């Protein structure tokens, strides 16, 4: 995998020169960063310097800059999102499936929720998946609650805390009590919405299938991989650099700094650790197919 991907970095098209959803050499750099970051865990060889090298290349080349709003990455018009390096295309008309982002929307959605928040699938949700308490608690308590007059979380500090909580319990199950299989046990995650950045449905009442492309590779992950590689000893990186990468991600999440006038979510050098990064990856990358790998690493 590594040798072929390294060869492809010189064969694939220049950044942004390929047609949409086809990989270019930035995708190859990203894949190498991810493989090298996990090399010690799966192969017993420390490759953190190479992980840092390729993650930084993704960032420094600047071809896929961070989106200005975290929430825009997971919407029906995310084909215009600057951050997505390699998307898996979904289309309500031409790529209909119960899998992909159609599942990610409907599995967390149920009929009564449509009275409060538009996810672009109408009342077609299945209500068969909920998030665990351990994940919800990675966000500040004030950011965990859904308010009917703020369905996009504009008034939250961390805009990544996208939960639906009305008439739902936080716990999916309480020890010592009988397990009840209902969609009100546990909060729903409304990160994925089949609507546009203008917060409009593609058609009135929503579509049967999703048009939200799945971001298989995106730049924010490169920021977090670079930071982690540095903390794990990558040669050439500095602690200040790692802190800068993490705070850039948090600035965007909090819509602060160059992203807006929200309350700052920045951390100090003393707060940055591998444990913090693991939690930050959960906050940033949840439901994007990386958590199991992160936990094993």
Task: Show the residue positions of the predicted features.
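Structured, solvent-exposed acidic/aromatic patches
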Residues: 1-112, 184-187, 201-219, 232-243, ...
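Structured loops at beta-to-helix junctions and adjacent beta-edge loops in soluble globular domains
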Residues: 88-91, 108, 122, 126, ...
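Short, cationic low-complexity segments
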Residues: 105-131
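Flexible, polar/acidic helix-loop-strand segments at domain edges
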Residues: 137-219
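Acidic, mature catalytic/reactive cores of soluble proteins
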Residues: 161, 236, 294-297
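Active-site-proximal region of nucleotide-activated glycan assembly enzymes
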Residues: 227
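C-terminal structured "cap/appendage" subdomains that terminate the fold
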Residues: 244-297
């Amino acid at each position: 995998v590594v040798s072929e991907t390294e060869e492809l970095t010189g064969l694939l098209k220049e950044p942004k020169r390929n047609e949409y959803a086809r990989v270019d050499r930035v995708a190859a750099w990203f894949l190498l960063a991810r493989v090298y970051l996990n090399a010690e865990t799966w192969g017993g060889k420390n490759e953190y310097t190479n992980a840092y090298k390729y993650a930084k290349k993704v960032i420094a080349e600047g071809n896929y800059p961070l989106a200005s709003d975290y929430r825009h990455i997971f919407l029906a018009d995310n084909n215009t999102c600057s951050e997505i390096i390699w998307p898996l295309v979904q289309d309500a008309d031409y790529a209909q499936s119960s899998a992909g982002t159609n599942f990610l929307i409907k599995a967390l959605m149920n009929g009564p929720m449509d009275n409060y928040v538009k996810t672009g699938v109408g009342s077609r949700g299945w209500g068969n998946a909920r998030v665990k308490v351990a994940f919800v608690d990675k966000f500040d308590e004030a950011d965990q609650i859904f308010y009917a007059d703020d369905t996009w979380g504009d008034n939250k500090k961390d805009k990544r805390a996208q939960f639906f909580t009305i008439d739902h319990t936080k716990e999916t199950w309480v020890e010592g009590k009988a397990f009840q299989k209902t969609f009100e046990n546990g909060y729903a995650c409304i990160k994925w919405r089949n609507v546009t950045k203008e917060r409009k449905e593609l058609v009135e009442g929503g579509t049967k299938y999703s048009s939200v492309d799945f971001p298989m590779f995106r730049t924010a992950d490169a920021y977090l991989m670079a930071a982690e590689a540095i903390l794990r000893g990558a040669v050439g990186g500095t602690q200040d650099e790692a802190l800068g990468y993490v705070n850039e991600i948090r600035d965007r999440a909090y819509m602060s700094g160059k992203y807006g006038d929200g309350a700052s979510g920045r951390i100090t050098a003393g707060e940055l650790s591998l444990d913090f990064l693991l939690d930050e990856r959960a906050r940033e990358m949840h439901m994007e197919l990386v958590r199991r790998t992160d936990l094993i690493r």
